[in-house]
């Protein structure tokens, strides 16, 4: 049986170098790997066929802070550049607009890579543990933060509960693929309170905001229940859920403490407001999310 822990972290929780005599391998005994999947809340614009991550360039391509939707570093960038205690290399397959399974919840464009597509990219690249990414069960942490678009796109659907069951089946089908490839450490990030985004507050009635909040809660409850079943089924797993509602609400309830005039303004500099735009968190919320993940794995990965 695997070990399943739920963590609410704050409260309880590119360049290619000159040719060398031999290939540079990220195989120092202390090197760790952060292998992530998700949507625009996690994307850094990484292309696994491009420049590979290294100690001096942990995102690989593009270099820090990457191509993010935060105005600067997002939670992935913070983890590998500020919260790491040793060299931690990011292989980030997240893709903006992603849903878990595009046949269940279509993304905003058909070209968007779903969680299924992202895992397929992993399977076709670093799953085989190549010389440039010799990860193993002990030194690799697999992170998944997806569901914002799944919930956001169908919370209103009268068949939401049925769709949620299908989403979870697909989600944990992908985790099974990762497990079968050798993944044993998993951190799953919950869907944050998207009903508090400026977009939802400005464009939805109070009743609809409450309905979307309920849909978020249902998603996160299903995530926890399915993770417990997944760890019961598969041996040797250490899995933790980070409740992203804690860092989000910490900032949104105290905006001036984080350099913002209020909880609803947004600015593409990622700093003047808590929001980068009307749906994506800025730098400070991303820092808090990263801190939450680091706290959950303190003493092992961070």
UniProtKB/Swiss-Prot annotation:
Reactions listed under catalytic activity: an acetyl ester + H2O = an aliphatic alcohol + acetate + H(+)
Glycan attachment points: 84, 101
Enzyme Commission (EC) number: 3.1.1.6
Locations listed in the record: Secreted
Keyword terms, alphabetized: Glycoprotein, Hydrolase, Secreted, Signal
UniProt GO cellular component terms: extracellular region
Name of the protein described by the UniProt record: Acetylesterase
